[in-house]
Amino acid sequence: MTDFINAEDINDVILAAAASELEQMVDRICELIGTPLEQTTELERQVIAAFGFGAVYGITHRDQLAEPQAHALSIRMLIKPFNYSEQQAVDFADDLIRVASDREAHPVMNTIIHRGIDGHRQFNQEDDEGLARNIQEILAAVQPER
């Protein structure tokens, strides 16, 4: 008897691997900025999440994920490791998708997402120096004046 691999099972494995990769990237970013995720401000958390959404785009392109898979991966990333509620994650993911496809909707967030695409490449190439510089420049630019 021949065992067949269920396409749904393969899909689950691909998404689980992508989710793990995103978590590792967020962990690495937090190490590089010297602040655990749970100690970041809400603004920093949102910036890192938008940056991570750029990584979702990179993974989607690399792994040829369909739109529903990319959406699910985005929501998964916002729930874990960012600890947004399911509804917050859905709403935030929808906002990120809108902003990513319309620069004029929120130019700063659009730029952060696109820098996250570069950040994903830096993470995969183990370019910690480039990744640290990338995220630190963004965080410095969005910090409110004191």
Regions found by a protein language model. Name each.
Residues 1-84:
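N-terminal low-complexity, intrinsically disordered segments
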Residues 89-146:
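Low-complexity intrinsically disordered segments
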